[in-house]
Structures are given as C-alpha cells and as structure tokens.
C-alpha cells in the first residue's frame, strides 16, 4: 500500500491536466447511501413497496406527481450531508490549476459544495429543482426551508433536476465530460464500479498517460489502468495528504 501511495502521489504531482471521474463510493463517508450496494438506497427504497426503478422514473412522476414529490422529500434530500476530505482534495487540485475538473455520477451536489467549479453531473443534481409543468427554477434551500412541494407560480410538482429512469442524459453535459476525458493527461476514477452505462463508457475515450482507479471492488477497467488501489477513498486521500 505504501508503494501504491508513493506512486499515486508522484503521478498527481507530475500531472497538470487531471480529470476526476467519481461515483457513489466518494460520498458514502458524507452519509449519502450507495444506490446499488447491499443495504444501500435501493434496498431502503424497496421497503416503500414499489420498485426503486419505478419510484425514480419519469413514469412515476407522471402517474402520481404527489407520490413522487413525497418520495423525493422522504428519501432524496440528504439535508445534513457535507463534503468530505475527498471532495475537498479534488476541489483543491482544481484551485491549484492541476485539474480540468470533475465528472460525477453522483446527484448529491457535494463537489460543488466543496468548491469545485468545473463539475459535470452526468445524472443531474439535487442542488437544483424545477417545476415539472412551467419549469420555474428553485434551489434546494427553497425546497427544504419552505418544505416546498408545489410551484408557487402554477401549482405544478417541483421535481429535482436529476435524470430519472426513462429520461435521456443531458447531451451538452456528456460532450463536456468527453472533452475533459480526452484532454486529460491523468484520469482518476474514484468510487465507481464503472458498470453503469452510458456514463461509464466514457472512460474508454481516455488516451492520456495515466489511468488511476481507486475503488473498493474490481472494475472492468482495472487491467487497463496504470495504478489500481482497492481501498476506501477517504483512507487513501488521508494517507496521501500525509505523505
């Protein structure tokens, strides 16, 4: 492990066009449940009596707008979550002009909360909401502080600005993410299994010098990586910062 940390530090220190690609493992330490792992959010959602895929779908929003927004308030707001050391480390490297930014599969908004400016949120963010009818925009604070569920303009359901099942990923976001990967000299994957498509398929477009994967479990890209560390992200970053 010590040798891996030394290698990681050397690569990071010698790179000036780092792109980060993050998944659920990065935010677990902030109290955000992993969606798909055992005991994760999907397991919790299943207790509500409907499938997680349906509850997080465009169909459910259209079939039962009231049920959908009640579900969002109960399961998705993550009111007390704060960025952890991994989010802070990524933001610091961007401030130091070593990083092109971060591409994330997460919807928690914690990269932006940590100060990262160049964030491509592939699946949207819970920091923004909008009316499903008239599209008036709301911030997360509006929804939480006022327990706001219906638009004060037209009465429509206020939904989070996330990609639901049955909806397409935002194409401008995909293009920006692809450019970040293609322009990077080092691509650092943190806390992602790299199996959720089409987002994970973006990794195959990396042509730079170093692919680094830090994840508890193996990924389909491990054999292509310069460095693979199967460990907890927080532990790795803490150790890296004391090297």
From Swiss-Prot:
GO cellular component term of the entry, any: cytoplasm
Binding site for nicotinamide: 35, 107-108
Active-site annotation: 123
One of the record's GO molecular function terms: NAD+ binding
Keyword annotations from UniProtKB, A to Z: Cytoplasm, Metal-binding, NAD, Transferase, Zinc
Amino-acid positions noted as binding NAD(+) in the UniProt annotation, renumbered to this chain: 24, 35-36, 105, 107-108, 123, 192-193, 215, 232
Signal peptide: none
Cofactor(s) recorded in Swiss-Prot or TrEMBL: Zn(2+)
Ranges where the Deacetylase sirtuin-type domain occurs: 1-243
Reaction equation(s) it catalyzes: N(6)-acetyl-L-lysyl-[protein] + NAD(+) + H2O = 2''-O-acetyl-ADP-D-ribose + nicotinamide + L-lysyl-[protein]
Binding site for Zn(2+): 131, 134, 151, 154
HAMAP family membership: Sirtuin_ClassU
Family statement drawn from the similarity comment of this UniProt entry: Belongs to the sirtuin family. Class U subfamily.
Function in brief: NAD-dependent protein deacetylase which modulates the activities of several enzymes which are inactive in their acetylated form.
Name of the protein in question: NAD-dependent protein deacetylase
Name of encoding gene: cobB
């Amino acid at each position: 492990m010590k040798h891996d940390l030394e290698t990681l530090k050397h690569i990071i220190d010698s790179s000036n066009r780092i792109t980060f690609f993050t998944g659920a493992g990065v935010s677990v330490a902030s109290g955000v449940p992993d969606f798909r792992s055992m005991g994760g959010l999907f397991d919790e959602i299943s207790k509500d009596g409907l499938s997680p895929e349906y509850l997080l779908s465009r169909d459910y929003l259209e079939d039962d707008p009231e049920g959908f927004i009640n579900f969002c308030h109960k399961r998705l707001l993550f009111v007390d979550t704060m960025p952890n050391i991994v989010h802070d480390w990524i933001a610091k490297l961007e401030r130091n002009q070593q990083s092109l930014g971060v591409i994330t599969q997460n919807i928690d908004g914690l990269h932006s909360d940590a100060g990262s400016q160049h964030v491509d949120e592939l699946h949207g963010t819970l920091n923004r909401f909008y009316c499903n009818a008239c599209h008036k925009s709301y911030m997360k604070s509006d929804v939480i502080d006022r327990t706001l569920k219906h638009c004060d303009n037209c009465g429509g359901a206020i939904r989070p600005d996330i990609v639901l099942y049955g909806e397409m990923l935002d194409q401008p976001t995909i293009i920006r993410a692809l450019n970040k990967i293609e322009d990077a000299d080092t691509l650092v994957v943190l806390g992602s299994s790299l199996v959720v498509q089409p987002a994970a398929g973006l990794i195959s477009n990396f042509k730079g010098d170093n692919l680094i994967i830090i994840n508890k479990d193996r990924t389909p890209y491990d054999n292509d990586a310069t460095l693979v560390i199967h460990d907890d992200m927080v532990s790795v970053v803490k150790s890296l910062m004391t090297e």
